[in-house]
Structures are given as C-alpha cells and as structure tokens.
Regions:
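Charged, compositionally biased N-terminal leader segments and the immediate start
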Residues: 1-29
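N-terminal glycine-rich anion-binding loops that anchor highly charged ligand groups
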Residues: 26-40
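A short, well-structured juxtamembrane/interface segment
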Residues: 49-64
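Buried hydrophobic positions in well-ordered alpha/beta secondary-structure cores of metabolic enzymes
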Residues: 74, 157-159, 198
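Short glycine/serine/threonine-rich phosphate/pyrophosphate-binding segments
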Residues: 78-81, 138-143, 164-168, 191-195
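Long, charge-dense
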Residues: 87-125
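C-terminal functional extensions of proteins
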Residues: 165-208
Length: 208
C-alpha cells in the first residue's frame, strides 16, 4: 500500500493536471497563476476564458499587498479563506463590514442596502485596500458609485459575485468604467471561494 500523499504533493499534482488539461492553451504569463489557482479551487475550466484582467492588474495587486494594503470582502466566507499569515506579515488585514451592527443600523435608517453602507465604511479606511467581492453584486455597484463620487480609490477590484440578478451588469460596469485596476469573472459565475482564491494567488506569489 502506497503512502498517502501530503497536502503539498496533492496541490502540486493538481496543478500539473490543470496544466495538462489546458493543453495548448496559452495563458498570459502575468495572469497564469491566478487563473490556475481559481481553476484549482473550482475545478471549472471556464475561468480560463471568463477571467478578465485590466492592464497589469496582477502586478498592481501584488505591489499593493507588498505595500501593506488591507483587503475588504463582502462575506465572512471570503474573509476566512484568505491567507492571513502572509497578509499579516506584509502589514495588512482583512475586513468584512457586512454584518457589523452599525452597518445594519445605518442601512435601515438611511433606506439603503447593507452592501452600500459596508462599502462606504471600507472606503473611509485610511489604508489602501483591495476590494474582493464574491457574493453581492450590490456591493460591486455600490463601489462603482463611490468611485464615481470620488469617495473610493481601490488599489484593485476583484469582481467575482455569483448569481443571476445584477451580477453581469455589475461586473461589466467595472470593466467599462475602468476606474481602478480589476480582475473580473465575466458572466454569472464566481463566489466567495473564487474571491479568496484570487487574493491567495497574489499573496502566494509574494511568498515565493
């Protein structure tokens, strides 16, 4: 009976299989590790086609992380999935304000969504931030509105909300307006796990 594979061996073999299954497909070298990390997380090769990157988005995201920026997510799941060991070493931390009592109260009293208030709260942070949105298209639309009003200047937008209502519109608006560097999963696919995977793909490149 052969010895069980160690976690790192499993991951290495998984990436070898991904490379094999991509075949002759040529990926942009700057974006390749992000795309493969998302495929590894989801087992979905559609991400080789639907992940869209603004010019040098990966490079800019890595530079922001090296500079100690924070990461803002729209779910606790995405927050939990991000490698905090590397992020903390770089001087950053992860925030998710969606379930904060003050956010809920402000949303109720103002008649707006918690997503908008949470993005507004994040925009008020003193440090540069990467916004990793994997669940709520309203958070992405709110962030775009705040950028239009010059109240938010993201270091990078990871726009990968999943679903059917306002999802594609929110993503396309980020791409069309291009007010900040972005990594967007076009179409309906995405999720908190995808948002976390993209953050980790950037962090792991710094680790190396």
């Amino acid at each position: 009976m052969s010895e069980p594979m160690k976690p790192m061996e499993i991951e290495q073999r998984s990436f070898e299989i991904i490379t094999e299954l991509l075949g002759d497909r040529v990926l942009d070298p700057e974006n390749e590790l992000v795309i493969k990390r998302v495929i590894h997380t989801t087992a979905d090769f559609d991400y080789a086609d639907n992940l869209t990157f603004s010019d040098h988005a990966v490079r800019k995201g890595i530079a922001a992380l090296k500079g100690g920026c924070d990461i803002v997510t729209d779910t606790q799941m995405a927050k939990a999935g991000i490698n905090k060991t590397i992020l903390t070493r770089l001087g950053g931390e992860v925030h998710c304000f969606m379930s904060d009592p003050d956010v809920a109260q402000e949303a109720k009293s103002s008649g707006v969504t918690r997503a908008f208030v949470s993005m507004e709260k994040a925009a008020a942070l003193e440090k540069p931030c990467i916004f990793a949105i994997g669940n709520a298209p309203t958070a992405l639309l709110s962030l775009e509105q705040l950028m239009e009003e010059r109240k938010a200047t993201p270091a990078l937008i990871i726009g990968v909300p999943v679903g059917f209502v306002n999802v594609e519109i929110s993503k396309e608006r980020i791409i069309e307006k291009a007010r900040a560097p972005y990594i967007v999963a076009r179409g309906r696919k995405g999720g908190s796990n995808v948002a976390a995977a993209i953050c980790n793909a950037l962090l792991y490149q710094i680790k190396r």
